[in-house]
Amino acid sequence: MLIKLLTKVFGSRNDRTLRRMRKVVNIINAMEPEIEKLSDEELKGKTAEFRARLEKGEVLENLIPEAFAVVREASKRVFGMRHFDVQLLGGMVLNERCIAEMRTGEGKTLTATLPAYLNALTGKGVHVVTVNDYLAQRDAENNRPLFEFLGLTVGINLPGMPAPAKREAYAADITYGTNNEYGFDYLRDNMAFSPEERVQRKLHYALVDEVDSILIDEARTPLIISGPAEDSSEMYKRVNKIIPHLIRQEKEDSETFQGEGHFSVDEKSRQVNLTERGLVLIEELLVKEGIMDEGESLYSPANIMLMHHVTAALRAHALFTRDVDYIVKDGEVIIVDEHTGRTMQGRRWSDGLHQAVEAKEGVQIQNENQTLASITFQNYFRLYEKLAGMTGTADTEAFEFSSIYKLDTVVVPTNRPMIRKDLPDLVYMTEAEKIQAIIEDIKERTAKGQPVLVGTISIEKSELVSNELTKAGIKHNVLNAKFHANEAAIVAQAGYPAAVTIATNMAGRGTDIVLGGSWQAEVAALENPTAEQIEKIKADWQVRHDAVLAAGGLHIIGTERHESRRIDNQLRGRSGRQGDAGSSRFYLSMEDALMRIFASDRVSGMMRKLGMKPGEAIEHPWVTKAIANAQRKVESRNFDIRKQLLEYDDVANDQRRAIYSQRNELLDVSDVSETINSIREDVFKATIDAYIPPQSLEEMWDIPGLQERLKNDFDLDLPIAEWLDKEPELHEETLRERILAQSIEVYQRKEEVVGAEMMRHFEKGVMLQTLDSLWKEHLAAMDYLRQGIHLRGYAQKDPKQEYKRESFSMFAAMLESLKYEVISTLSKVQVRMPEEVEELEQQRRMEAERLAQMQQLSHQDDDSAAAAALAAQTGERKVGRNDPCPCGSGKKYKQCHGRLQ
């Protein structure tokens, strides 16, 4: 009560921020008459003038009024569109490292041009981040004329582009692209083998469109670049055959309870656990299939990988549903993003889950992957010097934006008052009753010419509603991940009188639904439209537009509540744009996932008490409150998951930044010999210490062990025992110095043979490859540590502290291994004069030809073409990575001269 009173007197923080910014808007408006007088060339020249002022030390913030006035004037001349005052407010919010909440239809794309132009003046680059390639391309092409008019360059960063094209896109003043592509480019740059392969510049300013979708919904999904691990597809197929024999454990109070099942499912945490009965049965089935030996336990350490396969298969069958979590297209399992409803081509679940789903669906199983590099969106976007974002729904997540990204949320007022009617939820007992009520509502609305958008939470549900509408004879369009190719066309015409559109969450974010349909889309469909045709299309559209407004505007129907209130608000936000009329209503049933998992007992008890009849709906503030509480519970749980993920990833992030910083320094220098010499001293000191403890008696020395170690690991055959016999006065310190001097001398002789330049190149390559290889192993080890660390809680230890402690020890051990591996590899390298290599290669060829002739003689009855092909293969075969190296070292090619390929 007191807080409300104080807010009334002093205004909220949001009000105070907007009040301060409105003063700047007044200054911009006052400048407008002067800016209007400038010629096109003078307006364009302002960009160079602003840049010159920045170079002289002027602060960027001082340029805001004039820069925004210039962009507004340029927009009037290029697009015929003038930024509203609220858009100027939005632009200022975005320049202040804040999240701007701007309602649907308020022109976020045009608003973004203001801070993008201002920050591009620094010459450090601006990254505009969108949720998909279509929006990146559309926004870049739409805004390109404006930016180019002002003398700025625009780049588009799309998946699959060659490195030179990407480099060019990043070199532009303003770059448009998707969150995934920016993140993957960052990881790829940190796996490059030469400075020329890198594409990104220093991360300066990111302007994130649909910021809630990217920084919150996708925050639990790390970006991973992976390489193939060993093939275990056969095991997934064999385990998959067993799972249908298991019965799910139902709750004791449920109608389907029939005694103890074989596995229980926790839908909240999305986990599956075997019961005692299930363990006995699955062990019997595994023995019967010949996968496990009689008498063995599934939980024995030897069967840890088998347990991994069983868990993955159980999760695939019990928790992941076709056309909800994934679709099968062209023999491939493609993930469907739970938040946007879009397919995620190229993305795969980890921990063997994707392979288990492939086995379940009977499609080709692709190899498991090993992580080569990974980063979460949370940590990637925190790398930018300056971060800002905009969305139609941010206020519900303001606390998370503030606590994780240190970004304040500012709600920007609408240009015209919002007049949409949000009707109370209707709750039914069963799904069938709910669907029937939705069909009746659609019939009523379309009869009076009102367009309807039906929002569903999955592809499966959208197809269920579509089938019911078809049975009822109602014409409609379906927009989901299966039919997303014509997304823009469907959304553009969803505002037609009596149009019915069914959409998953993808519901055309970034595309406005215009009442009466889009006249621009109709004009674009004509090849060479005349002025008369365009005028007629506009006139027809105006009639339709007025008819839809008279019917009540766009009506939104939600077929069930989403886990997050924000995503429900996004669906509602498709209606009532720019002060238009509109309405919305959510239809729920006790069989909906949210109600079943989080709100079922209380609400169903309430409904039973009210004595509801089939087909009747409940509409009561208590029910609405119970649903809102359920959503808050889920949001709170998801926030905790994301926060915990970030706390663990922060540990890995510190290590990642250290490794990537070291790697980039290594890439940028051409001579690493000083580093190598320093490392060599450390490695030899540690190696000798293991066999000759410092300041110890000679009796404690293990000379044979040291000689063997130096021979095996550093290719140094030193007669240390002989030295000690001949020189009894040889001290420990002198001995250490002699061993190190010998190793340096041997190395220098190799350098003389190949030349200093070649040796420097080789040293750098070995360091990079060894670093990448050990970092990859370290990531896998960190992943294993992370999966089991929660068990430390049972020993009264804090899992997070334990994770920090152990991961630091692992990181320190990895750095020691790096030094050792580099010196060992460089010491073992065999160098020969070019003539010797040529001679060895000649001998190898002759031997190969001799073998080929012998094979031909032993297969004289074979088809001559096959024999010739065999001879060609054997005679001119390239050196395989696991073949002996042709230099004669006796090592595998990949560990010798093939290391740099």
Curated annotation (Swiss-Prot):
Stretches for region Disordered: 859-901
Assigned keywords, A-Z: ATP-binding, Cell inner membrane, Cell membrane, Cytoplasm, Membrane, Metal-binding, Nucleotide-binding, Protein transport, Translocase, Translocation, Transport, Zinc
Biased composition (Basic residues): 891-901
Binding, ATP: Q87, G105, E106, G107, K108, T109, D512
UniProt-listed SMART domains: SecA_DEAD (SM00957), SecA_PP_bind (SM00958)
Enzyme class: translocase
Catalysed reaction, written as an equation: ATP + H2O + cellular proteinSide 1 = ADP + phosphate + cellular proteinSide 2
Main subcellular localisation: membrane
Cofactor details (free text): May bind 1 zinc ion per subunit.
InterPro entries, per the entry: Helicase_ATP-bd (IPR014001), Helicase_C-like (IPR001650), P-loop_NTPase (IPR027417), SEC_C_motif (IPR004027), SecA (IPR000185), SecA_CS (IPR020937), SecA_DEAD (IPR011115), SecA_motor_DEAD (IPR014018)
Enzyme Commission number(s) from the entry: 7.4.2.8
Membrane topology label: Peripheral membrane protein
Any one of the GO CC terms: cytosol
One function term, GO molecular function aspect: ATP binding
CDD domains per the UniProt record, alphabetical: DEXDc_SecA, SF2_C_secA
GO BP terms: intracellular protein transmembrane transport; protein import; protein targeting; protein transport by the Sec complex
Binding site for Zn(2+): C885, C887, C896, H897
Source domain of life: Bacteria
Induction: Repressed under conditions of excess protein secretion capacity and derepressed when protein secretion becomes limiting. This is regulated by SecM.
Cofactor requirement: Zn(2+)
Annotated localization: Cell inner membrane; Cytoplasm
UniProt record similarity statement: Belongs to the SecA family.
Subunit structure: Monomer and homodimer. Part of the essential Sec protein translocation apparatus which comprises SecA, SecYEG and auxiliary proteins SecDF-YajC and YidC.
Function (record text): Part of the Sec protein translocase complex. Interacts with the SecYEG preprotein conducting channel. Has a central role in coupling the hydrolysis of ATP to the transfer of proteins into and across the cell membrane, serving both as a receptor for the preprotein-SecB complex and as an ATP-driven molecular motor driving the stepwise translocation of polypeptide chains across the membrane.
NCBIfam families membership: PRK12904.1 (NF009538), secA (TIGR00963)
Name of the protein: Protein translocase subunit SecA
Phylogenetic classification of the source organism: Bacteria, Pseudomonadati, Pseudomonadota, Gammaproteobacteria, Enterobacterales
